[in-house]
């Protein structure tokens, strides 16, 4: 069953979808389209490539800032599509869904579909409960204005991203604690195999831009 949580001042009991939605609406929400899923992947990378092309043809501060904003948005889009892949929603074929989610969405933005799926499904099972792995993201709020300002500034200046990259690489390599996740060993934040996939996919991006004589574009697309 798919369960829906309606959040009010108090956590209400779980409801089955057919208690709030019609059968037609449930079928519509559950429907998957291979064409739409793959088209969304193509769209994300097409927009990234187009942004780089526009800046290359008209290099100035305005096209640079526009490209940075658009590419950042599509990187977020890839992460969102990885979320869909973690739920098996990109394509009907499970193996194809996992490969596309991992190599086209997750690895280029330094993430991992399998590791994300492992904890994210726990989030759905325990939304806003003590066992919710995402509880730390919402529990501190509301926060004081000074605290909120610090959070915003950390994001604007990339501090949050650098911390995530540090944890991703060094905790993965150095931590020894392991656990099983879909048949894989997970060390630290992600498995070492995942780390290699991230590095490999970003090397592809790096050498693609390098072949066009623009090595530094990887900073915008890869990071």
Q: Which residue ranges define each predicted feature?
A:
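Non-catalytic, topology-defining segments of multipass membrane proteins
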Residues: 2-72, 106, 110-220
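Residues in and immediately flanking transmembrane alpha helices
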Residues: 57, 87, 96-97, 137
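Acidic (Asp/Glu-rich) catalytic motifs at the cytosolic membrane interface
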Residues: 75-94, 115-128
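Post-HEXXH active-site segment of zinc metalloproteases
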Residues: 92-106
